[in-house]
Amino acid sequence: MPSPNPIIQPRPDKSPTRSIILLAVAGFASQAQVRVMDSLLPQIASDLHTTIGLAAMVVTAYAVTHGSIQLVIGPIGDRFGKYRTVALTCATGAVLVAVCGTVSTLPQLALARLATGAAAGWIIPISMAYVGDVTPHDRLQQILGRYISGQILGQLFGQAAGGVLGDLLGWRNVFFVLAGLFALATAGLVFELGVDRRPANAAAVAREVCLAVTPPS
């Protein structure tokens, strides 16, 4: 009997190289979030009427969830398909990063960054697992090296965006630019998945999350 929730991967007629390039774009967008706040803190503190020290909580909020979420995502990516999971988290990231540009208080921004970190934290480890699945062993090191280059460029872009674009456009518009990067990655990933994909079962996703975070008895 066929599985009620088949794992959806990119269509077989699609090139793995293009799939990996799109994952690198997603990784670029994810890593651009990591350092973007460094240069924006003075603007944020001034606009939200607080101190730079207090504003730094938004950096901590992102780092906490971005790192800790990686402890539980493996089983979920395996269950629902790594490529589709990355596409879903990219779409979620686009929305959450855009929300960061609309908040009016520091606690709201901290919560938005907390949620953004939880979404972005899925992208790179699941993408690297997918690359390992579809790449021949003798080429894996080379392909992973190219994929990681996208992450490094994303960090550099994020830091530059926080400084240069922050001065030119303001801190809120920087988040809208980064949300656009996530949206661009989402569009490419969804196209690569194909039109015959099925939506994930929300109840099944919730069960997998509970199983992942519940310690064994």
Please give the residue ranges for each predicted region:
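Helix-breaking motifs and short loop linkers at transmembrane-helix boundaries and internal kinks
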Residues: 49, 81, 102-108, 119
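Juxtamembrane intracellular "pre-TM" segments in multi-pass secondary transporters
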Residues: 5-14, 193-217
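Helix-loop-helix hairpin linking two adjacent transmembrane segments in secondary transporters
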Residues: 108, 137, 146-191
